[in-house]
C-alpha cells in the first residue's frame, strides 16, 4: 500500500505536466504558505463556547460541531490565526519514509491535546498555540514500523479523585510499540498509579504465539465509564500466522486488564468456532481493529470494525467465511461479550478490512427516530444497522460474485450489498473500452493491459494472470470515515477511485519474479505459509499514467433517510504534484476525513494538494480553500472559544502518499 501511494503521487504529477498540452486547467494558483497569521476579527463576547472533547467530536464519531460563527457567508475571510510546530518530521528514525501526521486534537477547556506519529504528546493553548507541556514516549528509532502514525489521544476525569489531585484528569495515548500510557492532563507527567509506572504493555496479555512482530496502536483509545478500550494495527501479508488481532479494555485508574476480545476463535467454545476449521483458526492471525472505535455510553456498547484474517490475498489456509473478520461488532463495554455482529466481507481476498470509525446516528423513518450505526467501507458502500440489534436499516442482499481459479482457494460464492445507498465508487467490470490516457499511445497500452487481466467487477478474486481490484485496497473510504449532520440527516464521505492490479505468484517463483526488475514500483509481499506470494500496484501505464479516467477522488453527500446520493464532486487537484503553479481538478487520492459545522460547511484536507477546503454542505460547491504549509492528511476539528471559532488541522504530510512533509498544527479563524 505504501509504495502504491507514492507511485500514485508520481503518476498524477505526470498528468499535470502533460496537462499543459490541451487539457483544461481548473484554476491558477499562485499562493504559497508564508507562515504569516492574519489580523484577527474582533471577538464576539456573546458567542458561546463550543468544544471538541474527543476524537471525531463525540464518542459516536459524527465529526460534527455546533459551532456556527464561520458560515457560508463569511468563510472566505478565514485566515491563519496561529501556527504550532512540533519539531518532529521523522528524522533519525529508520521508518522516516513512512512518517505521517494524522492527529486530530481534542479540546479540554482552553487546552488542545494531540499526539505525533512517534508518540510525542503535546498540550497547547487553544487560543494562541503556545505550548503548555510535552511528553515523549521514547519510541525506539531503529525498527521498521508497519505504519508510522497516531491519530490522537483520549481524555478522562476520575470522579473519585479529589480536586487538584495529580492525575485526576488523564490523557491516554497508544504507541507504535504496543503500549498504553496514562499522563496527567495538567502536567504531562506519567500517572504512576496506572500499572505502576504509567503504562501497560499490550502484548503481555497475549500468548507468545499470538504476539506477532508488531502491534502499532494508530487510532486513539476510547473511554466508557472508567474503562479504556483500544485496538491495534498489524503488519499485512508477511505470513499466514501473524499476531492475533485483539481489542483490550483496561481499568482507567489502575491499568488492570478487564477483558480482551479477538475475532479469530482460538478457544473452541467461542461463538464463531463452528465457522472455522480448528487447525486453521489455531494458526490464522490478525482480524484486528486498527480503525477508531465508537462508544454508545447510554447503551454501554463499544462498536469495533474488524480487519482481514491473514494473509489478505490468499484464503486457502483459512477456509470458510471467516466469521467476525471484516465485521462490525457491538461489544458489551463491561465484559467484552458480543451483543451482535454483522460480517461485511466474507472470506476477504482483497484487503478490504474495515478501516473507518463506525458512526452513530439517529435516522428518521416514518416519524420514528431509529438509532443506527453507519459503516463506511473500502468498497465505497455504506452499511447501516440498528444499534440495538444489528438488523439492517437498509436491506442487504447476498449477491453472487466471481469464483476463484486458483488452486486451493475457495472464494465465498456471495457477498453482502446494501440496497441503499448506492455505492460511492464504481463496481463494474473493466473492459478495453474503459481505457484512459493522455495520448493514443498510453491509452492503447492501457487497453492492452486491461485486456490481459481478469476483471469481472468488484470481488473478482486474485489470480495468477493478474486481477483488477476495483476499488483498490485503499478504498473507497479509509480511516477518515464519514461526517454526520443530524439535522439534515446527511452523511458526508470522501472516497478514492483508483483500481489496483493484484497477482499471485507461485512460491517457487516468488523471489525470481520479485528480483527480475520486470515490475518496477510494485509492492511484493511473501505471504509465507501459503503457496503464493503477491505483487500489487495501481492500474497504470508504463508512462505512469492512470488507465482509468478521473476523478480519482471525490467528496459526496448522502441522504440517509432515502438512501440517495445528493451530490458528488471531485476532491483535490494536481497543484502540488508537478511543481507547476496550477492544478487540474481531477480529484486525487487522499487520507483524512471531513468536518461538518452548524455553519452549513464541510471542511476537509486529505488530498494530495496542500489545502484545507470548505464546501457548502447543501450543494457541494467549494467556497474557500486555505493554503497549508505541508500535506493535510488529517481530519480537521473546530471549536468556539473566547468569542472566536477556530478550525484546526495537522499539516505534516504523509510519507507513503508522497505529500510534502512538515510538523505543523494550523488554526484558522475569521480575519478582518
Language-model segments: residues:
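Segments forming glycine/polar-rich beta-alpha architectures that bind adenosine-containing cofactors
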Residues: 461-499, 504-506
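Acidic, proline/glycine-rich low-complexity intrinsically disordered segments
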Residues: 50-52, 60, 86-88, 108, ...
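Asp/Glu-centered strand-loop micro-motifs enriched in Gly/Pro and often flanked by an aromatic residue
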Residues: 66-75, 80-113, 138, 465-474
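Repeat-blade elements of multi-bladed beta-propeller folds
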Residues: 52-56, 97-118, 145-179, 213-239, ...
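Short, solvent-exposed loop/turn elements at domain surfaces
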Residues: 59-66, 88-93, 122, 312-313, ...
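N-terminal Sec-pathway targeting helices
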Residues: 1-17
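N-terminal pre-domain segments of enzymes
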Residues: 23-70, 413-440, 447, 519
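Extracytoplasmic/lumenal domain signature
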Residues: 76-89, 121-143, 157-162, 180-212, ...
Amino acid at each position: 500500500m505504501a509504495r502504491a501511494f507514492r507511485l500514485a503521487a508520481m503518476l498524477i504529477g505526470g498528468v499535470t505536466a502533460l496537462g499543459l498540452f490541451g487539457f483544461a486547467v481548473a484554476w491558477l494558483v499562485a499562493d504559497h504558505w508564508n507562515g504569516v497569521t492574519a489580523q484577527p476579527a474582533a471577538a464576539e463576547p456573546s458567542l458561546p463556547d463550543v468544544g471538541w472533547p474527543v476524537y471525531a467530536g463525540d464518542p459516536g464519531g459524527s465529526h460534527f460541531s455546533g459551532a456556527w460563527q464561520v458560515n457560508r457567508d463569511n468563510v472566505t475571510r478565514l485566515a491563519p490565526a496561529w501556527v504550532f510546530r512540533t519539531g518532529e518530521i521523522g528524522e533519525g528514525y529508520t521508518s522516516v519514509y513512512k512518517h505521517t501526521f494524522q492527529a486530530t486534537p481534542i479540546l479540554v477547556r482552553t487546552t488542545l491535546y494531540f499526539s505525533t506519529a512517534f508518540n510525542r504528546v503535546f498540550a497547547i493553548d487553544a487560543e494562541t498555540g503556545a505550548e503548555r507541556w510535552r511528553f515523549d514516549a521514547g519510541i525506539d528509532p531503529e525498527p521498521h514500523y508497519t505504519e508510522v502514525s497516531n491519530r490522537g489521544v483520549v481524555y478522562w476525569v476520575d470522579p473519585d479523585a479529589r480536586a487538584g489531585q495529580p492525575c485526576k484528569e488523564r490523557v491516554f495515548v497508544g504507541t507504535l510499540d504496543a503500549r498504553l500510557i496514562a499522563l496527567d492532563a495538567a502536567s504531562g507527567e506519567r500517572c504512576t498509579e496506572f500499572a505502576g509506572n504509567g503504562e501497560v504493555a499490550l502484548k503481555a496479555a497475549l500468548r507468545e504465539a499470538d504476539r506477532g512482530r508488531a502491534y502499532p496502536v494508530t487510532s486513539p483509545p476510547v473511554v466508557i465509564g472508567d474503562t479504556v478500550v483500544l485496538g491495534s494495527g498489524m503488519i499485512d501479508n508477511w505470513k499466514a500466522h501473524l499476531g492475533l488481532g485483539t481489542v483490550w479494555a483496561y481499568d482507567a485508574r489502575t491499568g488492570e486488564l478487564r477483558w480482551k476480545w479477538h475475532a479469530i476463535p482460538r478457544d473452541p467454545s467461542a461463538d464463531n468456532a463452528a465457522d472455522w476449521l480448528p487447525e486453521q483458526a489455531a494458526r490464522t492471525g490478525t482480524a484486528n481493529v486498527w480503525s477508531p472505535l465508537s462508544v454508545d455510553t447510554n447503551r454501554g456498547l463499544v462498536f469495533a470494525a474488524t480487519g482481514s484474517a491473514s494473509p489478505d490475498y490468499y484464503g486457502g489456509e483459512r477456509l470458510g467465511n471467516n466469521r467476525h473478520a471484516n465485521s462490525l461488532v457491538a461489544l458489551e463495554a463491561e465484559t467484552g461479550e458480543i451483543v451482535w455482529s454483522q460480517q461485511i466481507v466474507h472470506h476477504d481476498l482483497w484487503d478490504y478490512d474495515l478501516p473507518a470509525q463506525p458512526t452513530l446516528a439517529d435516522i428518521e423513518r416514518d416519524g420514528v427516530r431509529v438509532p443506527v450505526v453507519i459503516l463506511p467501507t473500502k468498497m465505497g458502500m455504506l452499511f447501516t444497522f440498528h444499534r440495538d440489534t444489528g438488523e439492517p436499516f437498509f436491506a442487504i442482499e447476498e449477491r453472487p460474485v466471481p469464483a476463484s481459479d486458483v488452486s486451493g482457494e475457495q472464494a465465498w460464492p456471495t457477498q453482502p450489498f446494501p440496497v441503499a445507498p448506492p455505492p460511492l465508487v464504481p463496481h463494474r467490470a473493466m473492459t478495453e473500452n474503459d481505457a484512459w490516457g493522455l495520448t493514443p499511445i498510453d491509452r492503447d497500452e492501457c487497453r492492452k493491459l486491461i485486456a490481459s487481466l481478469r476483471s469481472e467487477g468488484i470481488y473478482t478474486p486474485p489470480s495468477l494472470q493478474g486481477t483488477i481490484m476495483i476499488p483498490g485496497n485503499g478504498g473507497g473510504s479509509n480511516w477518515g470515515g464519514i461526517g454526520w449532520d443530524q439535522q439534515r440527516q446527511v452523511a458526508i464521505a470522501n472516497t478514492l477511485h483508483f483500481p489496483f492490479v493484484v497477482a499471485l505468484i507461485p512460491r517457487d517463483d516468488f523471489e525470481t519474479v520479485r528480483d527480475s526488475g520486470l515490475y518496477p514500483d510494485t509492492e511484493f509481499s511473501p505471504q509465507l505459509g501459503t503457496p503464493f506470494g503477491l505483487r500489487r500496484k495501481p492500474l497504470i501505464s508504463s508512462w505512469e499514467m492512470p488507465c482509468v479516467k478521473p476523478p480519482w477522488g471525490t467528496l459526496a453527500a448522502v441522504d440517509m433517510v432515502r438512501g440517495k446520493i445528493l451530490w458528488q464532486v471531485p476532491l483535490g487537484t494536481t497543484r502540488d504534484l508537478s511543481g507547476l503553479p496550477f492544478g487540474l481538478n481531477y480529484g486525487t487520492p487522499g487520507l483524512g476525513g471531513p468536518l461538518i459545522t452548524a455553519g452549513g460547511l464541510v471542511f476537509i484536507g486529505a488530498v494530495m494538494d496542500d489545502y484545507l477546503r470548505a464546501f457548502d454542505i447543501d450543494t457541494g460547491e467549494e467556497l474557500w480553500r486555505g493554503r497549508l504549509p505541508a500535506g493535510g492528511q488529517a481530519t480537521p476539528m473546530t471549536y468556539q472559544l473566547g468569542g472566536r471559532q477556530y478550525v484546526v488541522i495537522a499539516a505534516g504530510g504523509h510519507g507513503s502518499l508522497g505529500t510534502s512533509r512538515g510538523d505543523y498544527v494550523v488554526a484558522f479563524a475569521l480575519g478582518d
